[in-house]
Amino acid sequence: MALKSVFDFSQIRAEFEQAGINTRFIPVIWKHVIQNPNCQWDEIPSLPSGAYVLLRSKFVPLTSTLHTADESSDGVTTKLLIKLQKGEFTEAVIMRYDSRLGKYNGEPRHGGLRSTLCISSQVGCKMGCKFCATGSMGFKTNLSSGEIVEQLVHASRLSSIRNVVFMGMGEPLNNYSALVEAIHVMTASPFYLSPRKITVSTVGIIHAINKLHMDLPNINLAVSLHAPVQDIRCQIMPAARAFPLDRLMDALHAYQKKSQQRIFIEYIMLDGVNDDEQLAHQLGKLLEAFQVVVNLIPFNPIGSLSDFRTSNDQKVTRFQKTLRDIYGIRTTIRKQMGQDISGACGQLVVNLPKRQSLGTCSDVLTDIEDLHI
């Protein structure tokens, strides 16, 4: 039987409890593995003798390996290709930003350089969004909570990660229990990520949204809306047929009432599909009763997998102006990052590139995570 990841919390907790070993040693083990990913269990000091026996027989420090790390030409994006225990591959992306750029309320921002990690929750995806390369893979498998956390472990060796966004491969809310457990690990010792620095993105899995705040309070929710009318959503997001827009908006209203937090609305800009001014007005009317931040995302090419084209800059700016000036909705335009390594939004699809050398970050960008929500 395959050995389990030490970061699969429910597994290691159950084994420790069954063996009568205090679970307070688990974060100690995690900290050592983060600092020494190739360690032997006997190298961890001060564990009970029974813990060493259990770890050797049931667990490995990491079940995955970092296969390649490809850096964008501008040095701000690194795409990680990670090989899983059963031979599948998944991807994660490190994006580097400077939170000091720009102003907030007319004042210079505080902060500095830091990195956001875009994490995958599945290999492939069931949702089949027409503008997303991952959907072309179909669904392969769910990641375990340990495999999700291990992406953070691998990335932390390359950059100091402060923010995590579940916007990589897969639909996070379709792997709900592993998602919840992984985030509980990330926000505890020794990672100590703030829940407010974690964003979960979904196409709109209504039954999961209904319980999300109870299981993961204080995280950020992002919804891939992409159209303000159901027929266009279904055209570009086939899975939307299972989640009617009116029911989705009801679920978001209930979520916001409970969480008292703004919601990110993701809206990919597709030329001639969802970018005209009438749709901007429809989106504004749909969202004006909510506290939201709309993030307009220029479409990133995915080669022969799609015939879509990105909206031109004038259309994107006009769309933003309509939402912001007429409906008072805070609207940002996502900066395109990592296109040259297929690490941008919608471009994640497993391939096996040649390894490229890692460099240092010289250019930095502002991030939607710096919006005060």
Predicted feature locations:
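Auxiliary Fe-S-binding modules of radical SAM enzymes
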Residues: 1-90, 96-99, 103-107, 113, ...
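Short linear Ser/Thr-Pro motifs
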Residues: 72-73, 120-121, 201, 224, ...
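Short beta-strand motif preference
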Residues: 80, 92, 119, 221-223
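Residue-level structural signal for beta-strand termini and adjacent loop
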Residues: 94-95, 178
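Canonical Radical SAM [4Fe-4S] cluster-binding loop centered on the CxxxCxxC motif
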Residues: 98-103, 109-146, 159
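Glycine- and other small-residue-rich loops at beta-strand/loop junctions that grip anionic moieties
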Residues: 141, 198-201, 334
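Cys/His-clustered metal-coordination modules, chiefly Zn-binding fingers
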Residues: 150
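Conserved AdoMet/S-adenosylmethionine-binding subsite of the radical SAM
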Residues: 155-163, 168-326
